[in-house]
Amino acid sequence: MRYIVNKLFIKIVILFCVAFIGSCFMLHAQDTFPYPAIPKEIKDADKRLSFLIEHYWDRFDFADTSLLKRNIAEQGLSDFLDILKGADSTTVNDGVKIFVNRFVCSDTASTEAQLVKEYFVGKMEQYLYDYRSPMRNDALYVSYLQTISNSPLTDTFEREHYRYIINNLQKNRLGETATDFAFTDRGGRVRRMSGFKGRDIVLFFYDPDCHSCHSEMEQMINGKSLLNSNIVVLAIYPGAETDRWERGDIFIGKNIQKSLNSKGEGIEFIDGCSIGGEILSKDIYFIRELPSVYIIDKDGRVVLKECTAKDVVSYFQRSPCPALDF
């Protein structure tokens, strides 16, 4: 805990120095992001962090579109999102509201204001929502979307779109019980995911024609960490086109053979197809991209969400895995 506080304090000091130096050399143009200066009287680390977040955007000129082209805005936003990781949820939500109100509640009639809004909306999606972003954070993105969707300056279409994403991102969150569903296996039997409770489940949503699905599955198998009798891989085609799923028998069959040892022992694979494509049509799981991989523990809780093959291998080797929420 002391290490985290000290590290955060050092970052705040660095940001203060950058702000001071930047202000000394800034003439008519803003050449660096204008980080706020934290008053010396504030000694408590948490209060310094709260002040930094609350006043982070005070000196940034949201009307100057040249800052967008020179990447000054992007650097400032990246640092802001990084700083939010060290704050409590209340401070985070307050900071996000201040930020959103600054770029949304400007002169909406001007072309410059619209450019600024589009820029920050795009960057927030890129950093926090994009499937492969190292900064992806569902909880923070939901906080942001809730704020922007509640703005009176957000139109009806945008508001409905944001609320759709909010609703889906709040499904099957880390630590929560994974939503059960029915599927048909290769033998024609109707089964349920809950039937495997008591075992670790690698839930692998795939498409037979998806090259990335092939690659990710092979990486998981080559890692050998799934060679455990208490682990089951549920490879599920979430769509409604059963003819495409039937072609996938070759894909799954090849990978099963690769996973077996000389005694015929290996990973247990269950290959299934969503009944009527309900996983997609009813958004039972929010699948942004395929493959979409979850790890569900013996108690049926989600422990990794939308992870990579590398994350799966690391998890079952009991090595640290990237955190996707906070």
Question: Each PLM stretch: what is its role?
Answer:
Residues 289-290, 295-326:
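Thiol-/selenol-based redox modules, centered on thioredoxin-like
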Residues 214-260, 276-281:
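Structural microenvironment flanking redox-active thiols in thiol-disulfide oxidoreductases
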Residues 25, 29-56, 63, 67, ...:
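N-terminal targeting or signal-anchor segments and their processing/structural boundaries
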Residues 249-294, 298:
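Short, internal strand/loop/helix patches
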Residues 1-32, 305:
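Bacterial Sec-dependent N-terminal signal peptides
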